[in-house]
């Protein structure tokens, strides 16, 4: 695979390297030679819009896979299943010790099977390429993958004597709802109703913890882990306080329904918060874990003394690199006389692990799919060959997809493993 990247006038964007990584992951070649060259050009600056490198990889490889299936007489779904990553699949080249990296999991075959059933692939492929006057319809399948999360960030929240849970979050709000969704994990673990959760986010002046960037397809994975770590810290402290007040050992108690209960007695979380202020130390944030980021230390120090403080770093193990996957099916109608084409049907099945917010995930899956349709159908990069000035800079020259361009029927689901 040899990829040449038109990079624009500034530093390398890195798309070429990622394209090779994604190709090695999605199609699992036993041996692969990969080269990439980034060229500086006198053209307008550009940056990643979505999935840099992954999109190029799919565009290069999927027509090759489709052509191979036709030449070999193999079903298009079957050829993808044969080459799909499974389990802790290997990817990319080896490191200095000769060890290749691997992913945490891959259930791409399951995504293909689920998508084929939803799309009625076996039924519809028989009618593919049959002519109806000057029109012909065809069906196709393709795979996509991209990095799905990072690790090692901090979670921070306080339960105050008013019984509410005040979450501090460094995540920005991109409109995908992950800004709040990740903290439902902590609320659920504490038995706290969502209407009693107050979230402060996106302004570093408000004493926020060290968080992942709001991009790179990582927020849900990265920050649910951090939220889980913080909630685990709060549960440990709440049980210790209950043992001090009510007697017994911390392991005698459980946290649920806004209470710490055990030995036939209980405390509300509001009472636990008041006691945390009285006890001080680690309970209210005057003593902090050594492993948290210095940025989090400053924020937690500023918030100390207000209630039961939960602060922790995600130190959970991870075996491999986290990636997400999608299997996509589409039906297209082409007018052979005038060359026009229409997308008639589209189904996407995502392998993303545990789904936190189904509706938001559906928006992501179908929204990114429409973005890809735009790249394929109407959005082109055109510039003046002499001066490097952008020419396709208006909607009628570089047209994003409208409701008239996308299929009337679009469905999605998740593997759910």
Task: Please tell me what each predicted stretch does.
Residues 70, 83, 340:
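ATP-dependent carboxylate activation and anion-phosphoryl transfer catalytic cores
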Residues 71-73, 78, 191:
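Noncatalytic alpha-helical scaffold of FAD-dependent oxidoreductases
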Residues 81-158, 397-400:
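Accessory "access/gating" subregions that flank catalytic or transport cores
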Residues 1-57, 132-417:
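Gly/Pro-rich active-site capping loops and adjacent beta-alpha segments
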Residues 48-50, 76-82:
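Short, cationic motifs built from Arg/Lys/His that form the positively charged side of catalytic pockets
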């Amino acid at each position: 695979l040899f990829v040449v990247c038109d990079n624009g006038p500034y530093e390398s964007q890195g798309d070429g390297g990622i394209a090779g990584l994604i190709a090695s992951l999605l199609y699992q070649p036993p041996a692969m030679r990969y080269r990439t060259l980034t060229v500086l050009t006198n053209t307008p600056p550009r940056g990643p819009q979505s999935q840099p490198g992954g999109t190029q990889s799919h565009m290069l490889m999927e027509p090759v896979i489709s052509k191979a299936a036709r030449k070999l007489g193999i079903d298009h779904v079957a050829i993808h299943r044969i080459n799909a990553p499974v389990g802790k699949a290997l990817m990319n080249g080896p490191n200095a010790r000769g060890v290749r990296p691997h992913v945490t999991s891959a259930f791409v075959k399951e995504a293909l099977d689920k998508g084929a059933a939803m799309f009625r692939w076996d039924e519809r492929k028989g009618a593919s390429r049959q002519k109806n006057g000057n029109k012909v319809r065809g069906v196709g399948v393709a795979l996509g993958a991209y990095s799905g999360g990072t690790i090692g960030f901090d979670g921070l929240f306080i339960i105050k004597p008013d019984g509410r849970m005040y979450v501090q979050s460094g995540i920005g709000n991109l409109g995908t709802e992950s800004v709040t969704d990740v903290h439902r994990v902590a609320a659920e673990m504490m038995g706290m109703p969502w209407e009693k959760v107050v979230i402060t986010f996106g302004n570093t002046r408000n004493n926020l913890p060290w968080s992942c960037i709001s991009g790179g397809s990582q927020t849900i994975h990265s920050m649910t882990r951090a939220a889980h770590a913080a909630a685990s810290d709060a549960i440990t402290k709440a049980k210790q306080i209950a043992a001090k007040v009510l007697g017994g050992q911390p392991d005698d108690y459980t946290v649920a329904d806004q209470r710490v209960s055990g030995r036939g007695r209980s405390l509300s979380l509001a009472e636990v918060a008041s006691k945390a202020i009285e006890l001080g130390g680690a309970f209210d944030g005057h003593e902090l874990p050594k492993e948290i980021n210095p940025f989090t230390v400053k924020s937690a120090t500023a918030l100390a003394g207000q209630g039961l403080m939960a602060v922790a770093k995600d130190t959970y193990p991870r075996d491999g690199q986290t990636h997400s996957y999608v299997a996509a099916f589409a039906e297209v109608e082409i007018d052979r006389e005038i060359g026009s084409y229409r997308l008639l049907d589209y189904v996407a099945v995502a392998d993303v692990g545990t789904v936190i917010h189904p509706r938001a995930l559906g928006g992501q899956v179908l929204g990114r799919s429409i973005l890809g349709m735009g790249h394929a159908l109407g959005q082109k990069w055109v510039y003046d060959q002499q001066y490097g000035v952008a020419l396709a800079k208006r909607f009628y020259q570089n047209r994003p997809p409208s409701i008239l361009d996308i299929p009337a029927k679009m469905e999605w689901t998740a593997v759910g493993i």
